[in-house]
Amino acid sequence: MSTLHTVNKSPFERSAFISALNHLRPGDTLLMIEDAVVGARKGSAFAGLLENAVKTCSVYILGPDLAARGMGENDMIQGAKLVDYGGFVELVTSHDRTQAWL
């Protein structure tokens, strides 16, 4: 069973980001939204953890939230993919379950 893990809090403020990473299993998907997108910035304290995650899981970042924080695709770690709101819906419907990390 595939799981979509969504994280909306900055990894610099809450532990939900790390909890989600620790619960990822091969084939799962991580979707970073709202303030969580800052964790996907190249060179951030969390970049190495995410780069390891993309080896066995899919990592997506909500593009409008990234743009709202002054970042673009070139600011993201290697292997993460941008998704729009339609893509967000597609991710939810294509997984067996969704786990929201608050």
Ranges and model annotations:
Residues V38-R41, A67-M71:
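Short, charged/polar "capping" segments at the starts of alpha-helices
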Residues H5-T6, M32, A100-W101:
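Redox-cofactor binding/interface segments in oxidoreductases and associated redox assembly factors
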Residues R14, G43-A47, L82-Y85:
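Structural motif corresponding to alpha-helix initiation and N-cap regions
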Residues R69-L102:
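C-terminal structural segments of small proteins and small subunits
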Residues R25, V54-K55:
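Short conserved AdoMet
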Residues T29-E34, C57-D65:
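Short internal beta-strands
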Residues F46-V54:
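Catalytic-core regions built around general acid/base machinery
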Residues T3-F17, A36-K42:
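Short, glycine-rich nucleotide/cofactor-binding loops
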